[in-house]
């Protein structure tokens, strides 16, 4: 399988020890236009965990995820990613860190003139690692997300659900340790949302760490019936732990 490394006898991309904190927030905050969007955030995101991030629209869920891979810098406090303080990371540190994190956006973007297959390969091509996955492994990846017959299609030809599955495939092709998903089921129907969430659950069972921002409480309940997942909630700029009882 594309995520299994036969040479090492394990899942590709697992570079951490069980229980290690991959993301640490210590009194972290973020301001925009002089106003706090997030404040006094404290969190240890442990390796192998599955977390949901909830909160009203505009509460700062996307901002929180952006802080988790240094797309934004904290205004106050500290954020550590893979035990490195984001404030002192070099460009090389940032590049290495981002190779270990897969991101799935609600409105995923692709290069429309390239096939799905070529779009999936872009992260590896850009990072000089295209030889790390062969065509058979790429076929396995397409099959895993249910896009076996869509590899040669162009992005505009895909349905909303197919685009989201392609986005997930692109996020995991680098074999990341941590996967951040921002409303991955927001633009799809209930059935497709369940399929996407089932893939994230499968990744978690492989040892991947998952953080999903969502407002879909029914999907949260379904996942919680299958595995031990925690729910975090942002309210009035603060992060509530361990989260609301849903």
Q: Model-flagged regions — what are they?
A:
Residues 168:
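Hydrophobic anchor residue at the start of the ABC signature
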């Amino acid at each position: 399988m594309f995520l299994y490394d036969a040479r090492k006898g394990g899942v590709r991309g697992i570079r951490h020890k069980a229980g290690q904190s991959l993301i640490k927030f210590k009194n972290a905050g973020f301001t925009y236009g002089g106003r706090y969007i997030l404040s006094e955030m404290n969190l240890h995101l442990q390796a192998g965990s599955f977390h949901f991030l909830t909160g009203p629209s505009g509460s700062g869920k996307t901002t929180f995820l952006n802080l988790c891979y240094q797309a934004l810098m904290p205004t106050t406090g500290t954020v550590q990613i893979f035990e490195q303080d984001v404030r002192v990371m070099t460009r090389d540190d940032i590049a290495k860190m981002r190779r270990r994190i897969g991101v799935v956006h609600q409105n995923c973007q692709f290069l429309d003139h390239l096939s799905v297959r070529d779009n999936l390969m872009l992260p590896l091509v850009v990072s000089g690692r295209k030889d790390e996955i062969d065509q058979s492994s790429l076929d396995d990846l397409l099959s895993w997300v249910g896009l076996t017959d869509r590899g040669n299609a162009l992005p505009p030809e895909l349905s909303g659900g197919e685009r989201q599955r392609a986005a997930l495939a692109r996020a995991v092709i680098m074999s990341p340790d941590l996967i951040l998903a921002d409303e991955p089921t927001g633009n799809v129907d209930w059935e497709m949302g369940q399929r996407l969430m089932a893939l994230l659950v499968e990744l978690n069972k492989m040892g991947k760490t998952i953080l999903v921002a969502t407002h879909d409480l029914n999907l949260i309940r379904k996942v919680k019936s299958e595995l031990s997942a925690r729910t975090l909630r942002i309210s009035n700029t603060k992060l509530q732990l361990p989260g609301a009882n849903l």
